[in-house]
Amino acid sequence: MCMVSCSKNEILSLPNYSLQYSVEQVDFDTLFTETGSITRTIKLYNPHKGTLLIDAIELQQSSNSQYIMNINGVSGTIAKNVEIAANDSIYIFIQAFLNQNNVDTLVQYVDSLIISYNSKRESLPIVSWGQDVIKHKGETRESFTITAGKPHVILDSLVILKGHTLTIEAGARLYLHYNANLVIHGSLCVQGTYDNPVLFSSNRIEESYETLPGQWGSIIFRESSTANNFEYAIIRNAVNGLRVYGNAENPISISLTNTRIQNMSANCIFAENAHISASNCVLANANDYVLALQGGTHSFVHSTISNQGAIGGRNYVPSVAISNYSFVNEQECPLLQVVFSNSIIVGKIQNEIDVFTQNDTDILDVEFFNCLVKTTIESKYAHYFNSSIQFDEHENLFRNMYDLNFTLDTLSQAKDNGNFEVAQLVPDDFRGQSRIADTKPDIGAYEFFSE
């Protein structure tokens, strides 16, 4: 221990005077190679009544290191003769810049921060996992296939030409940069499976970005697009999940099966003049509409729509909006038919469904058949609702909707209330479990099973 006569400026050089560290190891999340990481911070604290002189702070692999540090505003792989005054501290900032590893799988990158002082060397491990990627920036492509090997990163846009098809195989991962879009003038064929879904997400893959919406643009379908299919896709954390620009003469066809679209800063699906057929789908949490259908023909069977809003706060508009005109320019969008059956539509506000007409005299072919809904328009538009159930918000519907777990609670209103004939059209739920085995199917994308 330091004696009473010790001065704050005295250099404490005996080995028993030690630093305190804010962490025992520096861990980075999985990182894309050749892309800088976020910064990790280490605090070195001197708890003593005199000054500690650090001979050197260095990265063990020196010039071969995949990391770089910054101390007192100076970047490099080594810093010498660093003083830490009594009861004071310094901060070390570390970033990773990983080289390509030339394999499809993750590779671990390990280094150590070596702190030499008072005739001793102390070590803090630095660990990260690097993933090589295939990058697309401003590309316009004819037909090609994305496989489950290296992830693909879209930095600006990837455009598929009219008459051509982008095929995405099971287990493939597409990561999009801020404001980047996947633009389809031709066709998109997504071939995921339950065990190996296709992922569309942000290229910020650190844990702190996992639920942040608005990190990339959208999957955009242009007028010439046709014959689009999604099977077991996960689309998350964008501005819009699907943005569909069809025309009345040739609506854009999109089939969605066993697909989740969630956590959007604007809309999960915003479609003009489209033909959307969806079954066993989950659309969850958007700050504007979850589902905006302007014109076209649509069918949603055994699907779950839930909206508690995403980070940033939702606007107080209904989750499901149906109209026979464009919300963008108010041009007519002929609405031929919209049918929801054995589906759930709930959310944070009192009215989660609304139907808008261009003229007060317009009558739209809209039906909510045997659905569980949260709405205030049922009395005004009774003809839209056929055998549907009003949601009782005092009951637990899902196991944990705040954790995006939309499997049914033990006492869920949706249990055993599905229409059997409708269930026969989609006999297995999102997980492949039979919903007709007990002849009492549940409403929504998931059949209840005790866990």
Language-model features: locations:
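Short, solvent-exposed loop/linker segments at beta-strand-coil boundaries, enriched for Pro/Gly
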Residues: Q60-I78
